[in-house]
A protein has these predicted regions:
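Non-catalytic C-terminal accessory modules of carbohydrate-active enzymes
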Residues: 5-7, 263, 275, 282, ...
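Extracellular/oxidizing-compartment recognition motifs
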Residues: 1-110, 119, 135-140, 155-159, ...
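Repeat-solenoid scaffold signature
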Residues: 332-365, 369-372
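The feature captures the catalytic groove of carbohydrate-active enzymes
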Residues: 8-33, 102, 108, 151-173, ...
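Accessory carbohydrate-recognition regions in carbohydrate-active enzymes
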Residues: 1, 42-47, 51-74, 84-100, ...
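Alpha-helical support elements that line or immediately flank enzyme active sites
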Residues: 1, 48-53, 118-147, 177-184, ...
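Structural helix-adjacent loops and short alpha-helical linkers that scaffold large soluble proteins
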Residues: 53-62, 84-86, 90, 128-142, ...
């Protein structure tokens, strides 16, 4: 629905607005008995408008209804805290995630309905932490592997009847395989992906210039919908000088691939990947760091600075003072700002630098979207295109993984780490599905505000560790009481 100025405005307000978008033309055949007619493919909607034109005979409309169609995910997680807005965010996020999953994951159910790697990595983690169902994730990983072209990289989206190539998305696929390895006890499947991973990384290795920076990239090198980046492509990505942002994403993938090869006994390959990691990191530190600002630039000429490049510097351990860098990332408004998609990686960096207490104040976009009448979360902050986009459902992962602090401490989730970062919350009751059962975390902040009490319950046969205030405690299967 759009108003006279072409704006959507509050989605609950329909007065004076017009529907502009997809439509179907249905032509009854004139028979007297009732007949069901509908669309040839699924449609997603907030409002439906019927425009009926009759000829010599009236049209009798007996019933208008819809059938809900989605992958059968079941919500098996819980997150309750002393902030009621978080439950509303979870509710809208879950609706968003459900509508973006059918026979494959969708980036959105209204427009492309395509399984894009950048979107799918986030969707898959949401699925694991809330339903425990890894099947659509496994299928997506296999399909992306099948999409690889002869040169070595994956398609940006697959299945699709039109080939599109976004080279950075191939690096997220490598990370997605590593995610699966950490969360799902299925080493045979992960091992079968190693040849494809090597092909992707081999393609990127051939794109590294003499200085050690990824450069001269062909095709569409989208990183984020930053308004000042043409089509979301970072400075230097398609030129000879190269891009720090893409180089660090390459390191991010290399680190995960090296871990996989090391764990599967391919020590020589792991060593070679580690050498490439060191080479790229050294090149980025030498050529892209600006000491006066304490920031990594996007390009060698140091004409562009973004949150993205510095977030990736933190996530890849390229930054030597990661916590201080993250504080600058949040405070320096002159940086190109991460949009809703790349905030997923901003939040991973907050967790990694023990700044997770700053997560809850970052949820303004989600709270405002609900006030704007959205019942699903949109693609970008301007809220003018896709009103339902799966990557914006990331709080469903952030709340258990960052705030409650639940993450794998060993492959296949065979060990668990609970490292909560509750911020201003004084109470957290969280549970999530695990391959061996259910993880339950119940925490209460004590009166001093600096310590926690409560309990952590792990599935049978699953141990782990509890991390708080720089100290670690062993967790055993079953109930663990925190005094």
């Amino acid at each position: 629905l759009y108003d006279s100025a072409g704006q959507k405005g509050n989605r609950n307000d329909v007065t004076g607005k017009k529907i502009l978008g997809y439509y179907d033309v249905l032509v009854p055949d004139g028979r007297q008995q009732p007949v069901d007619i509908g669309t040839l493919w699924l449609r997603t909607f907030r409002f439906v408008q019927l425009d009926i034109t009759t000829a010599d005979e009236p049209l009798q409309l007996h019933e208008l209804y819809n059938d809900f169609c989605a992958y059968p995910f079941e919500m098996k997680a819980r997150f309750d805290a002393d902030d009621a807005s978080l439950e509303a965010i979870r509710h809208v996020s879950w609706r968003t995630a459900r509508l973006c999953a059918g026979e494959t994951y969708f980036d959105c159910p209204y427009y492309e309905q395509l399984q894009y790697i950048g979107d799918t990595r986030i969707q898959a983690l949401i699925s694991l932490y809330n339903s425990g169902d890894h099947r659509l994730m496994q299928q997506a990983i296999a399909q992306f592997d099948q999409s690889r072209i002869a040169a070595g990289i994956t398609a940006s989206r697959y299945p699709s009847n039109q080939l599109q190539l976004i080279p950075p998305f191939s690096l997220y696929w490598v990370a997605m395989v590593h995610d699966y390895y950490l969360h799902v006890p299925d080493t045979a499947f992960v091992k079968s992906m190693l040849p494809g991973i090597d092909q992707v990384l081999g393609w990127f290795e051939r794109q590294v210039n003499e200085q050690g920076i990824v450069a001269n990239l062909p095709w569409w090198n989208f990183m984020d919908w930053v308004p000042k980046l043409p089509r979301g492509v970072p400075k230097g990505a398609t030129t000879a000088e190269g891009s720090a942002m893409v180089s660090l994403l390459y390191v991010y993938a290399l680190q995960r691939a090296a871990d996989l090869h090391q764990r599967f006994g391919n020590a020589a390959i792991a060593t070679r990947l580690q050498q490439q990691i060191a080479r790229i990191q050294q090149a980025v530190r030498r050529g892209m760091y600006q000491p006066a600002r304490g920031l990594f630039a996007d390009d060698a000429a140091k004409t562009s600075y973004s949150q993205h490049t510095n977030i990736l510097a933190v996530l890849t351990h390229t930054a030597t003072q990661p916590q201080a860098l993250m504080q600058r990332v949040l405070s320096d408004t002159s940086l190109l700002q991460a949009t809703i998609y790349f905030k997923f990686y901003l939040f991973r960096a907050l967790k990694q630098t023990n700044l997770g207490h700053l997560y809850l104040p970052q949820l303004g976009f989600w709270r405002q979207s609900i006030r704007d009448g959205l019942t699903t979360f949109p693609e970008t902050e301007n809220k003018m295109r896709s009103d339902c986009h799966a990557w914006s459902a990331s709080p469903l992962y952030d709340l258990p993984a960052l705030v409650a602090g639940i993450s794998p401490a060993a492959p296949g989730f065979q060990q668990v780490e609970i490292a909560p970062q509750p911020g201003t919350l004084t109470r957290i009751d969280c549970s999530m599905p695990h391959p061996a059962g259910t993880i339950v975390v119940a925490l209460r902040k004590k009166a001093d505000g600096n310590s926690l009490s409560g309990s952590i319950t792990l599935p049978p046969g699953i141990g782990g560790r509890y991390v708080w205030a720089g100290k670690s405690r062993v967790l055993r299967p079953g109930l663990n009481v925190l005094e």
